Amino acid sequence: MMITKQSYQKFALMRVFVFSLSAFIFNTTEFVPVALLSDIAKSFEMESATVGLMITAYAWVVSLGSLPLMLLSAKIERKRLLLFLFALFILSHILSALAWNFWVLLLSRMGIAFTHSIFWSITASLVIRVAPRNKKQQALGLLALGSSLAMILGLPLGRIIGQMLDWRSTFGVIGGVATLIALLMWKLLPHLPSRNAGTLASVPILMKRPLLMGIYLLVIMVISGHFTTYSYIEPFIIQISQFSPDITTLMLFVFGLAGVAGSFLFSRLYAKNSRKFIAFAMVLVICPQLLLFVFKNLEWVIFLQIFLWGIGITSLTIALQMRVLQLAPDATDVASAIFSGSYNVGIGSGALFGSIVIHQLGLEYIGFVGGALGLLALFWLRFITIKFKKT
């Protein structure tokens, strides 16, 4: 019996690991344009602020597609669905690597965004299903760790590959790694019938839960602020702080490394007081943005700000996702789809706001605007915390 239990634990952990790897590759490809923005703009003879709208387009496809695509795929067995998504993901990266103009690159990114829409709608609930008993919260933490490693390894390595070869090679390598992950998924995942996915009828039921709706609005607000600044952090560090490309790469690495600390803090502290944890994480996201320009030429201060910012955004993202799942246990996939859509409305809006700020005010002001949006989100958190104190 002991052998059976150990075998179960081993395979369950391996399955969680596969989902963590999947989160790694999906987050790497979503945000790697941030690390390659200047190179892509240069190759197509465009401005960074204009190319940055590619991030907006990607995010808005995800935000618009998450719920309807999840509902359309609600009855499909999950392993088969995941393998289909990875096939499209890989083909889209091949097109990215071959893109002969910006519009072809944009089209390929839309294909990737399509897979993203469904992947993040179903993954949180699936990783909890395959996790070992009594390890559900830790499994969600490992999923977040995969996302954090995308920032630690994915973005810096993507930038290094882009500098050594070119940005097209970065997308080619991502497609190759995704192929290996798909093979692991095919080998390790069990048959996963759709369960508690929810239906279209679940949507109006969830809409009647005011705290849940308040959390979705909070996600849009705080993530809009974050991406107003983060979408253009690479050109900010190079052009405003005037640090070298190597220092820029190292700062992106530090941002991702901080995500590991954020995942650890979530697993240890969230359950003790979820409301205070979310508020503290938001402060860590907001303050570094507001002070970014103030300390623009102090290298060690920028490193510290980026580290704290990375801790904040990672722990905040996991905490908000966990809160959504707690508030909608009867329709986890629908709730996750709306969460993913809300998050990507924030990403797209933030990248758009950042582009507008750059064109109208200048690159140096992105932190002030992003931080101000974050402060509005903090006030909103305070409001819903008081109004729904017993929920």
UniProtKB/Swiss-Prot annotation:
List all disulphide bridges recorded for this chain.
Answer: none
Its placement in the membrane is given as: Multi-pass membrane protein
- In the UniProt record, does the keyword 4Fe-4S occur? no
Residue stretches spanning the membrane: 16-36, 51-71, 82-102, 110-130, 138-158, 170-190, 210-230, 247-267, 277-297, 300-320, 338-358, 361-381
Keyword annotations? Cell inner membrane, Cell membrane, Membrane, Sugar transport, Transmembrane, Transmembrane helix, Transport
Q: Which domain of life is it from?
A: Bacteria
Q: Which family does it belong to?
A: Belongs to the major facilitator superfamily. SotB (TC 2.A.1.2) family.
Q: What this chain does, per the record?
A: Involved in the efflux of sugars. The physiological role may be the reduction of the intracellular concentration of toxic sugars or sugar metabolites.
Question: What protein does this entry describe?
Answer: Probable sugar efflux transporter
